[in-house]
Structure formats: structure tokens, C-alpha cells
Amino acid sequence: MSMLKPSGLKAPSKTIKHGSTLLKAPASVATAPAEKAPSSEKSSSTTTADAHDDFVDDFRVGERVWVNGNKPGFIQFLGETQFAPGQWAGIVLDEPIGKNDGSVAGVRYFQCEPLRGIFTRPSKLSRKVLTEDEANGTQTAHASRATSPTSTSTASAVSASPAALLPSGIPQKTSPLAAKEHSTPSQFSNLSKTASGSVSNLSEAGSLKKGERELKIGDRVLVGGTKAGVVRFLGETDFAKGEWCGVELDEPLGKNDGAVAGTRYFQCQPRYGLFAPVHKVTKIGFPSTTPAKAKTTVRKVVATPAALKRSPSASSLSSLSSVASSVSSKPSRTGLLTETSSRYARKISGTTALQEALKEKQQHIEQLLAERDLERAEVAKATSHVGEIEQELALVRDGHDRHVLEMEAKMDQLRAMVEAADREKVELLNQLEEEKRKVEDLQFRVEEESITKGDLETQTKLEHARIKELEQSLLFEKTKADKLQRELEDTRVATVSEKSRIMELERDLALRVKEVAELRGRLESSKHIDDVDTSLSLLQEISSLQEKMAAAGKEHQREMSSLKEKFESSEEALRKEIKTLSASNERMGKENESLKTKLDHANKENSDVIELWKSKLESAIASHQQAMEELKVSFNKGVGAQTAEFAELKTQMEKVKLDYENEMSNLKLKQENEKSQHLKEIEALKAKLLEVTEEKEQTLENLKAKLESVEDQHLVEMEDTLNKLQEAEIKVKELDVLQAKCNEQTKLIGSLTQQIRASEEKLLDLAALQKANSEGKLEIQKLSEQLQAAEKQIQNLETEKVSNLTKELQGKEQKLLDLEKNLSAVNQVKDSLEKELQLLKEKFTSAVDGAENAQRAMQETINKLNQKEEQFALMSSELEQLKSNLTVMETKLKEREEREQQLTEAKVKLENDIAEIMKSSGDSSAQLMKMNDELRLKERQLEQIQLELTKANEKAVQLQKNVEQTAQKAEQSQQETLKTHQEELKKMQDQLTDMKKQMETSQNQYKDLQAKYEKETSEMITKHDADIKGFKQNLLDAEEALKAAQKKNDELETQAEELKKQAEQAKADKRAEEVLQTMEKVTKEKDAIHQEKIETLASLENSRQTNEKLQNELDMLKQNNLKNEEELTKSKELLNLENKKVEELKKEFEALKLAAAQKSQQLAALQEENVKLAEELGRSRDEVTSHQKLEEERSVLNNQLLEMKKRESTLKKEIDEERASLQKSISDTSALITQKDEELEKLRNEITVLRGENASAKTLQSVVKTLESDKLKLEEKVKNLEQKLKAKSEQPLTVTSPSGDIAANLLQDESAEDKQQEIDFLNSVIVDLQRRNEELNLKIQRMCEAALNGNEEETINYDSEEEGLSKKTPRLFCDICGCFDLHDTEDCPTQAQMLEEPPHSTYHGSRREERPYCDTCEMFGHWTADCNDDETF
């Protein structure tokens, strides 16, 4: 409350004024409006004025009187007032039990202290004290009005000095508060504020009345401040009392077409007509209803709610009475307004509208100043009240301090008495405690000894049993050790026999080596000089095979030595363990004997200790009894004054005894617990002993198992060595067979080419497996490096042997002449074999064509799959869009629910504030205008919300339908794709089976050809024995190399089997990843084994090719002998062409290898993609289930929406039932709404952007999911193919796998790499989009919360008292029905265009009948002439 503007009123002087002067000031103030008032008002108040003139003549200013016969005081004012017509008397009371300080509604009539002034009718004054009966007799008739809220609720105003106004010589009571008020000179500036709120009320009402009267038919008007239209009707109606204005609106926002309840008042289109009270209709451009005025009135009401509650002015009284009358008699509110406005409009005739507005504003400012003065008066009252309370507090504190001192003295005395008694008690208790301790110690020792004795006895028994068990276990272990030694001896004998067998096999090998050497010598003598090149290559291969054989022998010896070492080490370990077990048994026997001796000693000591403690216990008990008797004697000899204390001591002794007994029982329990613990410990020791024995037994069993496993391993290894030796023997025998086949190796070219192709296909499969197992590359590189080193050594040896072979071949040229004769027969066989080769080649080409067709079919299926993936991606994107729409609708529903909650809260607050507003509201008509406008806005908002809710429901239904349709489409598409995939798989499987059948037929033909070839070779062997001996040496060398390679293969296979066993053992303990690693290692080793096999096959093929070359050269020599030298040149050209073909085949083979490596990489990538696709397929299924759940939730939400609608309807009914005038203006709420709408628009724009990003992210996710599903399917196909390849790899090498599958796998690998790259890119994009979505969702939530809490943020600038009122929303009120909270006047169903009968009104009287109204009380129910003038103000 800082500096305020000067009011223009002079402060009253401090000197005492006489009655004559006092009468002039208010009279002048009162006469001014009285002169302006028309004669009609004078006629209404003459009766009351004349009735009081007699009383005024009797009394004079300064005379001592009693108000109502019981309130003494002095008359300070006599005359007319502004707050009510007629003569009034202003009295200064002796005590502060009045209602003001001489001023009412900002007009000062006299001056006195606060709460000492009162205005009353002169008829209520008396010059002497009246009895209660007399006072009651005068007041019974008008008790109801005397105690009305308007009379009792008038509060005090600004404080001032009372002595200044009282006449001299009059005794006066002054309180300390009054003295304080005299000393504050600043309060004199606030003494007189002449502008009144009542005048502002009246001027406002008058201006409104003028506005009403200025309305004409055809004027442009605003109904409720928002609906524009043209006046078509003015006058009274049948559906409600009062003047009504029928308006034809510009937009279809009305309720009818000019007719209500069957009677037509004007003509317009349907929903363009609207009826409203005249005071709610404003002419466009009318100055009295400006927004600025509305704001100031609202600010005035909100600023001082507390002051108005306590001390309303005369204007507030008049407004309250008008509001009360409007509430009590709803249909006649307009009549009240018209009458009051007509009464006050006569005073303001002759002035323009602008002057009236200025006056209204000045009066409003003055009323605010008056209210500030009232607030200051309240503060002064509060300070005086606080002073009085402080004095009372001081008195109370003094009394409290005295009482505290007295009580402290008493407490000191009592403390001394208690301390003396406590000392005696403590001494006695100490003695008792000492004796207790002694007894407890003795009992505890006795119990300990008994427990230790029992424990020792149990321990002895247990140890005896344990000794017996250990002796039995020793005997058992000795028998086991004997058995183990016997088994060791048996294994040694077996090893010796196996060693002798190995020696025999080695001798056989030496003999075979000698035979090979002899064959070499024969070959050297049989070969011709022209075969230098071929013999060199053969010798090189023979030397390489010999080296491999030597290496294999060395490795075999190493393995044998390592096995021997392992066996010896295991034997030593077993012996050591047997020794440790025997030593531990001996120790246990010694420990048992020591324990027995200890037990005997402990038993003797326990018996001695028990006897000693028994004697001590008896002596202690006797001494304790004596002490107790002495204490009893001392108690009996005490003084009579201490009998009470002794009685207390006895009770304490009994308590002590009880405690002692409890402690004894507790000790017994403890002892029992300790016994149980000891027993448990003994049992634990027993368990430990058992565990030790079990562990020893387990160790023995483990040792036995180890021995058995070692023996088994040794036996297995010996069996393997024997098998290897047997295989070597078999291979030696096979070498003899192969020596016979050497001359006919030219016929094997076709078969070898087929084998080469089969090996190439298997190499491709193996390469794919090698690429899948990426970790096996390191081992393969190491092996390749070793192979390269071996090849370098072989090349060095070959260069050395070439020089030697050139010399040896010169002597062999002569033998070739003999062979020319036999070549003619061989050529015939060769021709037949070539024909068969051509047939096989044709079959191979047909098989290749079939594979190409299969590849084309696979490509077509892949294209179909891609198309279906795109369709699935589109469907998933649509599903995600629907999901986003669902989420948006759910958020909107939540916002609507929150708005409804806010409205209900506002309703509750408004209901609570109705009573306060009824007391404190001043300008009821203006406020009702504002509140009606606010209520209309709220109704429109509710209608908008309902429309939005219906739209949201429709959208939710549409979304549900769309989701169901999309889900059905997705399911149908998935089923169709599954069916197509299954059909394609069946087709592929049929093709594979056909290919297999073709391969089997080709293999059977190949076997038949082999059989024929073997028969023919067996026939040719007899003829060419001499030539075969020369080739035997080469074959032996090659077979030795094969043996070495096969041994290596066998060793690697055994290692692989061991690794498999280890993997199976590790499955229980390790995870799947370790198992996979071990399996990968095993596969790597298998790949290495296969590579070595392939290398050996390649070396064999090279040797065969060299043989073929030799045979070709022999053929050429025969042709030279039979034919001319020209034929020899032709044969050489043919040989060159064949060599070129072989080289081309080699190049193609290498290219195929590279392609296989690439495809294997692609296969691995595809497998990874398949895994991801499988995961995404699972996610998609989860999303389908989530969609179903969302649909269920939607149905639940729809049900909730219906319930909410029902609640809204019920809430509207409740709101219509309780409606009152509100204080908050729509300007603040509209500004807030515009701000929030702007913020909402911004948020919606952001949401649209986010939705676009979400849609893109979801489309990417759907693409990834489809790719992952394809990947899973491809993985399944790859697994099936791998299983088939494994099954085929177990078959002989001659079996060829279909090339069509390999080609399909290659294509899949290429597409898989591209898909993997796309998936990685899409995953990165999806992660970024998800982050953005999360951030933007957080922003949206914050903005929504800010939007919901916006009203609270806007009202922070108001005072703490205004915060509660600023949140309140206006209540609906209908002027036609006179009901609150149901609907607004513009939305009243009675004026709606309906064929139904009009509803019954709540007013049951005749509408044409004029109701009685009192101008003084401003209430309905009686006329002004019948009013009791006993009221006070």
C-alpha cells in the first residue's frame, strides 16, 4: 500500500464541531443527489421521511441516548444520508461495539474512533435505559431484518481521533488502542473519501438502462460479446418475465427461427434466432460497456476479497441485497435491475455518455481508496488485538513462572528423598548381585564339566567307529592296489607283444623297399632314350613319395615314443598316489591311538573337577542362606518410619528373586542350546570325517579311472597302430594290383577327369566351409607355408635327379622298340574308352544344363521373394502409421480428460466461492454480464471438446478397422509367401533328387567302365609283365607317399575325434560359444585333412598324366614305325592340343577355386543376415500381438469415452443447478488460450515432423525385418545343403555333388553381401531416428504439461489471496429458467426450435402480477411503505 492519488476530499479538522456545523456537511452532500432525483422517487420515500420527522425534532446533536435501550452514546449526526432515504441518526457509542467511524460508503457524516459509530433510525433511540422486555417489544416485529447479513456484516473503516468530534465536558472512555491511534498523524489523510461504490453501481446501472432504452429494432448488436446480429424484437415474452431482445444472428449460432414455445415474435432462418435479456445485448459502439471498464471492475473485485468479507460498504450492501433477491426469486431479477436503474438514472439526467463514464471511473477509484482505508482500519484493529493478547500472555507467563518455581522446590525435596532410598536399594542390590554371580559361576562350571564329559564320551565312541571304518578302507585299498599292479603287468606284456609285431611289420617294409629298388633297376634297363622327360617326372614323384614315406615313419616312431612316455608317467603317478594313501592311513591310525589316550585322561580329570565343584556349591548355598537370614533380621529391626520403604524393598526382593529364577531358566536354556551346538559340532566333525574318507575313496576311484582311461587310450593307440600297419599291408598288396594296371593308365584319362571335376566340386564345398570358419585360416596358412617349403625341397631334389635320369633313359630306348608291337592292341582299347568318355561328357553337359535351369528357377524364386518383401515392407509401414495415429488419438483423449478434470475442479472451487462472492460482490449487473460471457465461452469450449471427442472416437474406429484390415492383409501375404516358398522348396528338392539320380546313373556307368577296364588290363598284364616291372618302382614310391599322406590323414582324424570328445565333455561345463569354437577348430583340421587328401590326389593325377604322356609317346613311336614320319608329327600335334586343354582345365579349376572362396564369404554373410532376419521376424510377430492388444485397449478406451460422455452430461446438470456470479474476466483466460493455442500449433507442427521421421524410421525397420526373415530362410537352406554335403563327403571321392546347388549358393552369397551392407546402413539410420524420437517426445510432454498448468503460471503476479479466485471458471446461468450450471441463456432449450411442449417454469405465480419490492431494503417481499426502519448501517 504505497502512495495513493489524492481523493479530492478535505480531511476533517481536529477541533470539535458542534451539531449545527455537523449537519451541514452531510446535508450538502445528500441534497445534491436529492435535487437531481426526479419527483417519482420523492413520492416513494415521503412516507418514511414523514414518519421520522417527529423523532428528529425530539433529539439534538450532542444529546446522550441509548440505541435500542442498551447501547449508550452521544448523537453526532441527524439528517438524510446517501446510503438510504429518510432521516437517520449518527451516534458515537461509549464502547467499541459499533459498525463504523462516522463514514459509510466513502461519505463522512461525523468523525469518531473505529467501531464506535453507528447509524440508526431516530425511532430506535431513547433517553434512558430500557429493560429487556421493553427492548424486545420494540424489536420483535423486525428482528429478522435487524439481524440480516447486510446489517451484521458491515465492517469498520479508517481509524481517527474520537475526541475531536465529541463535545467538551462529555465523559469518554479511551482504550490504550485509542491512545496509540491519536499518536499516528499519518492516519488523518485517510479520514474522508467522498466517492462511493454505491454511486458507481447506480451510475453503471443507469448507463445500462440507457443502453437498453436506446436499443431499436434494426440496430446492429452483440449478444454476449461474441455473437453479432440485428435486433428484430423488443418487449415482453410469454416464456419469461421482463424485457427481452430477439436478435437475428449473422451466423447459425442461435437456437430458433424467431418462435419459442409455439408463439412467433419475428421471422428468420432456423438456428439464426436468439432471445437474450436487454442488459446482455450491447449496441455496437456503445461507450458504457468498454473492455477497460470490465477490466477495472474485475480488478476491483479480485483485489480486496478479505476486506469485503469483513466490512462491506453501502454499495456492497445494496449489491448484496440485489443478488440475494435475484437468487431467492429468480424470474424477477430483471425487474429489480430495471427498478433500481430507473431510480438512479433520474439523478444523472442531463449529462452525456462520456461524462458518465468519467464519473464512473472516478467513483471506482474513490471506492478503491475507501476499501484501502477499510483495510488499514482492519490492520489497526489487528494490532490492538495483538497488544491485548500480548498483555494477557505476559500475565500468563508470570503466573507460569511462579508455578514453575514452586514445583521445582517441591521436586528438589522429592529428589532428595528418592536419592536416599535409591542408595539403600543400590547397596542391597549389589549384595544380591554378588551372591548371584557366585552361584551362577558355580553352576556354570558344573554344567561345563558335565558337558565336556558327555562330549568326550561321544567323541571316543565316534573315533572307535572311525578307526574300524579306516581299517576296512585300508584293506579295500590294498586289494585295489594289488589289482592295479596286476593290470600294469598285463599291459606291459601286451606292449611287448605289440612292439614285436611292429618290428615284424618294419621288416616287411624293408623287404618291400628292396623289391621297389629292384623294380627301379629293371625300369632303368627297359626305358628308351626318348622317354627322358617322362622318366624325369616319374623319378621326381618317386623321390617325393619316398621322402613322404620316411617322414611318415618318423612321425609314427615319435608317436610311439610319446605314447610310451605317457604310459610310464601315468604308472609313476599311480604309484605315488598309492604311497600317499598308505602314508595317510598310517597317520590316521596314529591319530586314533593318541585320541584314545586323551579321552582317558579327560575322563579322569572331569570326575575330579565335578567332585570339587559339588563341594563348593554346597558351601556357597549355605553361605547364601545365612546372608538372606541376616538381611531379614536387619529388615525386622528397622524403624517404623521406614516400613513403607522396607515393603518396597521386599517387593523389589521378590522381583529380584523372580529375575533370579528367570535368569536361572535362561541359563538352563543357554546350557541346552550350547549342548545342542556341541552336538551339532560333533555331527559336523563326523560329516567332515565321512567327507575325508569319501574324498579318499573318490581319489582312489579317480586314480583307477585314470589308469583305466590310460590303458584304454594305450589300447586304442595300439589298435590304431595295428590298423595302420594292416592298412599298410593292404596298400602293399594293392600296389601289386596297381603295377598290373600301369600299361592301361591311358584308358583312365576319362575317369580321372571326372574324378578331378568331383574333387573340384568338393574343393568348392570345402572352401565354403573354410570361409564360414574364419578362425581356421591361420592354421591353413601355416600348413600352406609348410607345403611350400616341402615343394621347394622337392624341386631341388627333382633338379638333381633329372640329370641322373637323362643318362639312365638313353639305355631304355632300345626296350621301347619291343613295346611298339603291343601298342596296336592298346590303341583299340583306347578308342573304345574315348567313345565312352564322349558319352560321359555329353551326360555331364546335360547335368550342367539341368543345374543352370535350377539356378534360373532359384533366381526366379529370389525375385518373387524380393517382391513379397517389398509388399511386406509397405504393409508394415502402413501398420506403423496407424500405430502413430493411435498414439496421437490416445494423447488427445488424455488431454480431453485432463481438461474435463480441470473443469470439474473449477466447478468445485466456484461452488466454494459462491458464498464469499455473494457477500463481497459489488456491481452485480456488470459482473453478471461478464460471467455470462465467460460461461458462453466455456460452453463453446465444451461443445468443441465434445466435437473433438466424437471425431476422435470416429478416428479410433477407423484406425481399428484399418489395423484389422492391414493385419489380415499381412497374415494373408505371409501365408501366401509361405505357401510359395514351400512349393519352391519342393520343386528344388525334386530337382535335387533328379540330379542325384542322374549322378548315380553316371556313377554306375563309370563303375561298369572301370570293371571292363580292369578285365582288359588283367588280360594285358600277361603280355606286358616285362614293361610293368619298370613302372613298379614309380608306383611303389607314389603309394608310399600315399601311405604317408593317409597316415597323416588318420592322425588328423584321430585328433579331430579327440577334439570332438573334448567338446562333448565341455558341453556340460562351458557355454555354446566355446563348443562352437572347438567345433570350428575341428572343422579347420578336417579342412586341412581334406586339403592334404586333395594334394595327394593331385600328385597321383600328375603321376598318371606323366604315364599318359609316356604312353602317348610310345603310340607316336609305333605310328612312326607303322606309318611315316608325318603321322608322328600329327600325333605330336594332338599331344600338344591335349596339353593345352589340360592347362586350360587347370586355369578354369583355379578360377573356380577363387569363385568358391568368394561365394563362401557371401554364404557366411548371408548366414549372419538370416539370423538377424529371423530375429526381426520374431519381433514382427510380437508387434502383431501388440497390435491386437492395442485394439483391445481401443475398445476399452471407447467404453471409457462413453462413460466420460455420461459423466459430462451429469456434470453439466450439476453445474446448471449451481450457478453464481464469478469474479474472473475472460480477457486473461482468452489471452492464455491464444498463447496455448499458438504453443499447441507449434507442438503440432513438431509432431507432424516427428511423425514423418517416425514413418521413415519404421519403413526402414520393416525393410530390415524382411531382410532378416529372408536371411533365416536362406540359413535353413544353407544348413540343409551343408548336411547334404557332409553326407556326401563321407561317401567316396568319386561321387560328384550337383553343381546347380553350388551355383545357387554363389548367387545367394552375392545377394547376401549386398543385403548385409544395406542392413548395417539401415540399422545406423534407425538408431539415430529413435534418439530423435525420444528427445522430441520429451519436449512434447513438457509442452503439454506447460499447456495444462498455464493458468497457474499466469496468476503468479497476483497476491496470495487472489490466487484461489484467479483459477475459478465462471458458472453458467440462464435468465429464462433462472437456473445455475445447466446452460446459458443463449443455449436455453425453451427458446430452441422444438415441437415439444415448453417446460414448466419454477415460478408458480402469475407472470403479469407485480411483485412487492422495498427500496430501502432492496429486497422483494414487501413494499417500501411497509418497511421497518429499525435497520442500522
UniProtKB/Swiss-Prot annotation:
InterPro entries in the cross-refs: CAP-Gly_dom_sf, CAP-Gly_domain, CLIP1_ZNF
Compartments in which it is found: Cytoplasm; Cytoplasm, Cytoskeleton; Cytoplasmic vesicle membrane; Cell projection, Ruffle
Pfam families referenced in this protein's UniProt entry, alphabetically: CAP_GLY (PF01302), CLIP1_ZNF (PF16641)
A GO CC term assigned to this protein in UniProt: cytoplasmic vesicle membrane
Topology of this chain in the membrane: Peripheral membrane protein
GO biological process: cytoplasmic microtubule organization; positive regulation of microtubule polymerization
Regions of compositional bias (Low complexity) in chain numbering: 32-49, 140-168, 319-333
Disordered as annotated region, ranges: 1-51, 133-208, 319-338
Zn finger (CCHC-type) location: 1412-1429
Domain of life of the organism encoding this protein: Eukaryota
Stretches of the chain forming a coiled coil according to its record: 351-1353
Extent of Polar residues compositional bias: 184-204
GO molecular function: microtubule binding; microtubule plus-end binding; zinc ion binding
Main location: cytoplasm
Boundaries of every CAP-Gly domain copy: 79-121, 235-277
Entry keyword set: Cell projection, Coiled coil, Cytoplasm, Cytoplasmic vesicle, Cytoskeleton, Membrane, Metal-binding, Microtubule, Repeat, Transport, Zinc, Zinc-finger
Function, as annotated: Binds to the plus end of microtubules and regulates the dynamics of the microtubule cytoskeleton. Promotes microtubule growth and microtubule bundling. Links cytoplasmic vesicles to microtubules and thereby plays an important role in intracellular vesicle trafficking. Plays a role macropinocytosis and endosome trafficking.
Recorded domain comment: Intramolecular interaction between the zinc finger domain and the CAP-Gly domains may inhibit interaction with tubulin.
PANTHER family according to UniProt: CAP-GLY DOMAIN-CONTAINING LINKER PROTEIN 1, DYNACTIN 1-RELATED MICROTUBULE-BINDING
Protein name: CAP-Gly domain-containing linker protein 1
Native source organism of the sequence: Gallus gallus (Chicken)
Gene: CLIP1
